[in-house]
């Protein structure tokens, strides 16, 4: 509502504030309050199920190198490698990186092929708070292998720990 509209209705400043306050209270009573923009481990598992198309996840082959404690979550170094011969019949097709408690659980997806030589990468990721990082690798035979690593964040990506 603009100032001109308020003046047309002959409302005082006090009445406008009262109506606005009543609106906020009504919204709060009906559950229309802002929620924390954070994913849950349940949402990360749901996203992982989408990425794997419901396939069974097997432990092994995937190695995550991640600091146990990072001072700044906005640029956490992560190294991922997948043990694969990378031949025409046995290679890594894709690697997906997820963070259980980031606003958007899926951090990155990388594609590989037999000519990649190695299924390995190093990058920096944003970690909102202390949480578990999940890496899933899709193999050429359609199977999925995964690993998890815990990272404690002293100061998160948003400036909070």
Model-derived regions, located:
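N-terminal secretory signal peptides
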Residues: 1-12, 22-25
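Twin-arginine (Tat) signal peptide motif
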Residues: 8-17, 35
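C-terminal segment of N-terminal export signals and the immediately downstream linker at the start
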Residues: 30-63
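Short edge beta-strand/loop segments characteristic of extracellular beta-sandwich folds
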Residues: 77-85
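An anionic, turn-rich surface loop/hairpin at beta-sheet edges
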Residues: 103-126
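Extracellular Ig-like/FN3 beta-sandwich strand-entry sites
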Residues: 128-132
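Short acidic/polar inter-strand loop motif in beta-rich domains
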Residues: 140-146
């Amino acid at each position: 509502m603009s100032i001109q509209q308020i003046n047309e209705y002959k409302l005082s400043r006090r009445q406008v504030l009262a109506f606005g306050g009543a609106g906020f209270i009504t919204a709060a009573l009906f559950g229309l309050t802002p929620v924390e923009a954070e994913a849950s481990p349940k949402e990360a598992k749901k996203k992982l199920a989408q990425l794997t198309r419901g396939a069974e996840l097997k432990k092994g082959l995937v190695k995550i190198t991640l600091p146990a404690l990072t001072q700044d979550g906005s640029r956490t170094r992560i190294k991922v490698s997948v043990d694969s011969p990378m031949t025409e019949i046995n290679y890594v097709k894709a690697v997906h990186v997820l963070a259980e408690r980031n606003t958007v659980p899926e951090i990155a997806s990388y594609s590989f092929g037999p000519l990649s030589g190695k299924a390995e990468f190093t990058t920096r990721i944003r970690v909102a708070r202390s949480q578990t990082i999940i890496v899933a690798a899709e193999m050429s035979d359609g199977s999925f292998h995964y690993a998890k690593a815990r990272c404690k964040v002293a100061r998160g990506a948003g400036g909070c720990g």
